[in-house]
Amino acid sequence: MAYPFQLGFQDATSPIMEELLHFHDHTLMIVFLISSLVLYIISSMLTTKLTHTSTMDAQEVETIWTILPAIILILIALPSLRILYMMDEINNPSLTVKTMGHQWYWSYEYTDYEDLTFDSYMIPTSDLKPGELRLLEVDNRVVLPMEMTIRMLISSEDVLHSWAVPSLGLKTDAIPGRLNQTTLVASRPGLYYGQCSEICGSNHSFMPIVLELVPLKYFEEWSASML
């Protein structure tokens, strides 16, 4: 979960988020090395008294500063494309959940069940119980089984929304008239919070998302109680 004054990412709860964290560290290291080299060159230019006014061309240098950036871009692009294809790959999901964005709440439908639908509204601050999180708690949580492939179908009834859960590495636009899909696989149980990540009106900040990931046995008990 997130912590006050946190600067980094939330702990990864899915294989995709773990890959994204590794890619972030990989890219950040490349950026750090390039920035260090640029600062070193600038400081050397400011402190040295040597000049090369007679130099008209330098084929070796031009070759290096053409090939080296290309290699660096390839080192960034290859792992990025790998993760992109992983995020779009959906193989035999065990469960499908349809998510619809509204101004300003979410509705969910478990399409594998005959009549398992509900709306999810934010709990007002005045109604919170001790220990509950302000602006993040909802009246109906999305209960899902852990360690299973879940397909999320996401759309909107009115304006643009975005369904995002940072610790799972999920952020999918909810667009009216279009059905987007994403895959969710949680590696451990727990409560995972997200919010609408697309400005959608005056109450945009009051559209939280709460996923409750539980073992399959407890999910079956919950789904039976909801029918």
Curated annotation (Swiss-Prot):
Mitochondrial matrix side: 46-59
MF terms in GO: copper ion binding; cytochrome-c oxidase activity
GO CC list: mitochondrial inner membrane; respiratory chain complex IV
Membrane-related topology note: Multi-pass membrane protein
Superkingdom of origin organism: Eukaryota
Annotated binding of Cu cation A2, by residue: C196, E198, C200, H204
Keywords: Copper, Electron transport, Magnesium, Membrane, Metal-binding, Mitochondrion, Mitochondrion inner membrane, Phosphoprotein, Respiratory chain, Translocase, Transmembrane, Transmembrane helix, Transport
Annotated positions binding Cu cation A1: H161, C196, C200, M207
Location within or outside the cell: Mitochondrion inner membrane
GO annotation, biological process: ATP synthesis coupled electron transport
Coiled-coil regions listed in the entry: none
Gene3D superfamilies hit by this protein: 1.10.287.90, Cupredoxins - blue copper proteins
Residue stretches spanning the membrane: 15-45, 60-87
Keyword Metal-binding in annotation: yes
Cofactor note: Binds a dinuclear copper A center per subunit.
Mitochondrial intermembrane side: 1-14, 88-227
Record field: catalytic activity: 4 Fe(II)-[cytochrome c] + O2 + 8 H(+)(in) = 4 Fe(III)-[cytochrome c] + 2 H2O + 4 H(+)(out)
Class of the enzyme per the UniProt entry, highest EC level: translocase
Co-factor requirement: Cu cation
Residues the entry annotates as binding Mg(2+): E198
Subunit structure: Component of the cytochrome c oxidase (complex IV, CIV), a multisubunit enzyme composed of 14 subunits. The complex is composed of a catalytic core of 3 subunits MT-CO1, MT-CO2 and MT-CO3, encoded in the mitochondrial DNA, and 11 supernumerary subunits COX4I, COX5A, COX5B, COX6A, COX6B, COX6C, COX7A, COX7B, COX7C, COX8 and NDUFA4, which are encoded in the nuclear genome.
Role summary: Component of the cytochrome c oxidase, the last enzyme in the mitochondrial electron transport chain which drives oxidative phosphorylation. The respiratory chain contains 3 multisubunit complexes succinate dehydrogenase (complex II, CII), ubiquinol-cytochrome c oxidoreductase (cytochrome b-c1 complex, complex III, CIII) and cytochrome c oxidase (complex IV, CIV), that cooperate to transfer electrons derived from NADH and succinate to molecular oxygen, creating an electrochemical gradient over the inner membrane that drives transmembrane transport and the ATP synthase.
Entry's family note: Belongs to the cytochrome c oxidase subunit 2 family.
PANTHER family to which the protein is assigned, alphabetical: CYTOCHROME C OXIDASE SUBUNIT 2, CYTOCHROME C OXIDASE, SUBUNIT II
Name of the protein described by the UniProt record: Cytochrome c oxidase subunit 2
Organism the protein comes from: Equus asinus (Donkey)
Native organism taxonomy: Eukaryota, Metazoa, Chordata, Craniata, Vertebrata
